[in-house]
Amino acid sequence: MTKKERVATALAHREPDRVPMGEMSIEAGFANRLLGTSFPVVYQNYERDRQVRESLGIDYVNMGDWPSYDLGLDQHGYRICRSAYGDEYATTGSSRHIVKPLVATMDEARSYRSPDPRQIKGELVRAFAADEDMFVFGQIGGPVTILDECLGMEEYMIAALESTDEIQLLSEKVLTFEAEKAKVLLDAGADAIIVGDDIAFNSGPFLPPKIMHRVVYPLYKWLIAEIKRHKDVKVLLHSDGQLTPIMDEVVACGFEGLHSLQPSAGMDIAEIKHRYGDALALIGNIDLDYVMTRASPAEVEQVVKSTIDAAAHGGGYILSTCNALVDSVPSANALAMYDTGHRYGMYHHTGR
């Protein structure tokens, strides 16, 4: 079974030859340390991202397209960039802060124009689709993450409560761009789409239910329908945090998979598999707060085995950390995770 077939089979809730494995992102520092290389410390790099996944025996890659434009340096030497959405931010390469938000006031929401989709080229998706047998996810943004990054998180949340109509309008405009982005990524060869949209704290959703039903869920439904009108592919949601109170809504929106399942936020994968495993393919749940970053390789092995036991039966599970292989993950722990997945994740070996 090829990597692409393995992931597609799991997403269809059937058992492949082995539990598929992969990461939504692998940070540059981790990749360079594992490979002994000095690839650029940037978010995405084809050769680095290919080599590190090959080294770990990973089955999928997740690539987006996030254009930004260099505006020069500020008085402190920080680089100033303009995103595709129109906000401007200062960046050190590993962090950023807004210097000019998407709109100065909510009164500008009506005059704000949806970004030009011609900015999206899909080059990395096209490269992976052409040269590798890995399953290729194309990632786009969701209404919450885009606006909290372009306005500031606190400013976004206040506006969602006090200027709900304007936030709804801005969300519609940025999601029009994201829908067009998804179409470009699919035409470039993406096999499925992931909507990256962090909507919850570790304690529960960012926004109250009545606001979610105004500025989040209807837009998810529209976005999924728009993507599927272009091509009938699986559409999944990535969100960190505690989603248990809104899992019914996630399913009702039309998502067919969920990534993160953050255990430190109380996401119990056995319970989620029991309640939602027929509707959602599950990706993630390997802890980053302690297990991958501070535990021993032997502890990592035991957690991987118990997670596979809880979630892999009947298909519908893909082994992954609950976010990304970040720089603070020791190489030995990543190798332990993926080696265990290769050995213990064989369906005919375990009898699942």
Regions found by a protein language model. Give the residues of each.
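A basic- and aromatic-enriched beta-loop-alpha substructure that forms the phosphate/nucleotide-
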Residues: Q75
